[in-house]
C-alpha cells in the first residue's frame, strides 16, 4: 500500500525489491527464482554449519602461491581484486546494490571461508571498462553496511579481510546527520570482533578514515601494504600547502615530494610499526593464505560482560 502520503507506486515504489535493495540494504539480492536459489546454494556452501563449525568448508586444489598479475591496475574495484586472490576466482558479494562504495562478501583462501570488507572507488564492466566511480571516502551507509557484515562474520567465527583504499570522510548533509554514529558502529564492530582480522592497504590510507578501516589501532592482527601504497595523515600536496602557505608552485611540489618520502608512504608506516610487511601486489594471495592459516587458532579470552552499546 501507499503508506506515504502523496506517494504512489509510479512515483516511488518503496515496497519494491529494487528499492529495498538499493536504499536500505534490507534485500541482499534481487533476481529470478532460479537466480535466487543458486545464490542460496552458493551461500550455504560457504558458511560454517554453526558458530562453532570449521571455516575450512572445502578442499582446495588451486595453487596457493598463484601470482595475481595486473591487480594494481584495478585496485579501485575490489571485486576484481577479491576474485583474483580467491580460490578458483570465486567471490560471493552481499548487498551489492546498497552503499556501492563499500564492498562486502565472502571468498575462499585454501578452502577457508573469509569475509571481505573493501573500499570501492571504481566499478568496471565485463569488458574491463570503467562504468562507475565514487569518492575515496567513508559514508554513513557504507560504514553501517561494513559494521553489519563484520558482526555477521564474527558471529560465525569467520575471519575478516579488509582492503583499504580511502582518503577521508564524505562531506555532505547526510554525513553531518549520520556519519559520526555510523563510524562509531563500524569501529566498535572491528574492535569487538574476536575472529582473525587482516588488513590489506592497496592505495591511499589517509587520516582518521584509514584508522577506522581495521587498522592496528582498532584491532587488526596483521596489516599488509602494497609497496606503492600511501599511508599518512593527509595527502602530501595538501600538507605542503598547509605548512608552506607562502610558497610557489615549484616549491610546493618539492616540499610535497619531501613530505611523501618521510611521512606519506608505506615504508615510513612500516618503520613505525603500523604495517607488518610490504608486499608486491602479485604476491597478495600467498601472503593472505599464510596469514589466515597462522591466525586459524586465534583465541581471545574476553572479560565477563553483557554486551556493548553500539
Regions found by a protein language model. Name each.
Residues 1-310:
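Ligand-binding clefts of soluble mixed alpha/beta catalytic domains
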Amino acid at each position: 500500500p501507499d503508506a506515504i502520503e502523496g506517494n504512489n507506486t509510479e512515483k516511488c515504489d518503496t515496497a519494491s525489491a529494487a528499492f529495498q535493495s538499493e536504499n536500505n540494504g534490507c534485500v541482499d539480492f534481487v533476481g529470478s527464482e532460479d537466480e535466487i536459489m543458486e545464490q542460496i546454494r552458493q551461500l550455504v556452501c560457504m558458511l560454517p554449519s554453526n558458530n562453532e563449525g570449521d571455516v575450512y568448508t572445502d578442499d582446495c586444489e588451486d595453487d596457493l602461491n598463484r601470482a595475481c598479475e595486473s591487480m594494481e591496475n584495478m585496485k579501485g574495484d575490489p571485486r576484481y581484486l577479491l576474485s583474483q586472490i580467491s580460490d578458483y576466482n570465486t567471490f560471493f558479494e552481499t548487498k551489492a546494490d546498497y552503499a556501492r562504495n563499500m564492498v562486502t562478501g565472502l571468498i575462499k583462501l585454501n578452502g577457508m571461508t573469509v569475509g571481505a570488507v573493501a573500499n570501492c572507488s571504481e566499478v568496471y564492466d565485463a569488458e574491463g571498462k570503467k562504468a562507475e566511480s565514487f569518492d575515496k571516502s567513508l559514508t554513513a551507509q557504507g560504514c553501517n553496511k561494513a559494521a553489519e557484515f563484520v558482526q555477521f562474520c564474527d558471529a560465525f567465527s569467520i575471519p575478516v579481510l579488509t582492503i583499504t583504499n580511502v582518503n577521508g570522510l564524505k562531506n555532505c548533509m547526510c554525513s553531518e546527520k549520520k556519519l559520526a554514529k555510523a563510524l562509531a558502529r563500524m569501529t566498535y564492530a572491528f574492535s569487538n570482533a574476536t575472529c582473525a582480522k587482516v588488513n590489506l592497504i592497496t592505495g591511499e590510507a589517509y587520516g582518521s578514515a584509514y584508522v577506522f578501516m581495521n587498522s592496528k589501532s582498532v584491532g587488526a592482527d596483521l596489516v599488509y601494504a602494497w609497496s606503492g601504497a600511501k599511508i599518512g595523515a593527509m595527502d602530501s600536496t595538501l600538507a605542503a600547502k598547509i605548512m608552506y602557505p607562502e610558497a610557489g608552485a615549484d616549491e610546493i611540489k618539492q616540499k610535497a615530494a619531501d613530505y611523501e618520502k618521510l611521512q606519506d608512504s608505506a615504508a615510513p608506516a612500516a618503520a613505525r610499526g603500523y604495517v607488518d610487511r610490504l608486499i608486491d601486489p602479485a604476491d597478495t594471495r600467498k601472503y593472505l593464505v599464510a596469514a589466515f592459516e597462522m591466525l586459524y587458532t586465534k583465541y581471545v579470552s574476553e572479560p565477563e560482560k553483557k554486551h556493548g552499546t553500539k
